[in-house]
């Protein structure tokens, strides 16, 4: 479980900063940067970021006003960011989750550039971007799609078994190690 290093760092950080939103963001900065700089990916794009978004939502988001909402199609259009077009309806196998992860990561990279240009935030710097609302709006949008895909995969692969989409993600991390770098 090579991905466990990042997963454990995130879990330890979340536990240590559960009542310290600024501490969470400060601690996330080097972890996020290290994940981006990793030569050979050990923890997939969607699995890493869904955990990051989950901890952000628990620790930081409750104190943020106004609340951080996911970007909408109109928001993307207004910033000159092309829409993410992918048919999630047929995502019901690990290979399809991996394909979805690859597709949305590619789109996300372009979105980071466009959002950075439109908003003036350092979206291309993983040490800094986590301190800015546009980063979280983008990743909330992506995570909403991933949660939908995970729920669908979980229901089709293991009908009526998982309690939450995050439980499905944790199952993949625990039982399908070979897929973790790709999802």
Where are these regions (language model features)?
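C-terminal accessory segments of proteins
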Residues: 1-183
């Amino acid at each position: 479980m090579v991905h466990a290093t990042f997963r454990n760092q995130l879990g330890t950080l979340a536990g240590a900063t559960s009542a310290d939103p600024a501490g969470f963001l400060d601690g996330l900065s080097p972890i996020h940067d290290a994940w981006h700089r990793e030569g050979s990916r050990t923890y997939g794009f969607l699995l890493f970021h869904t955990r990051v978004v989950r901890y952000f939502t628990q620790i930081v988001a409750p104190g943020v006003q106004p609340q951080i909402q996911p970007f909408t199609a109109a928001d993307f259009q207004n910033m000159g960011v092309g829409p993410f077009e992918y048919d999630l309806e047929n995502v019901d196998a690990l290979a399809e989750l991996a394909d979805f992860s690859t597709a949305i990561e590619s789109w996300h990279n372009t979105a980071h550039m466009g959002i950075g240009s439109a908003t003036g935030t350092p979206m291309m710097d993983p040490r800094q971007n986590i301190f800015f609302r546009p980063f979280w709006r983008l990743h909330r949008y992506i995570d909403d799609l991933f949660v939908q895909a995970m729920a669908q995969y979980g229901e089709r692969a293991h009908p009526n078994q998982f309690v939450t989409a995050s439980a499905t993600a944790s199952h993949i991390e625990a039982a399908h190690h070979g897929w973790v770098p790709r999802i």
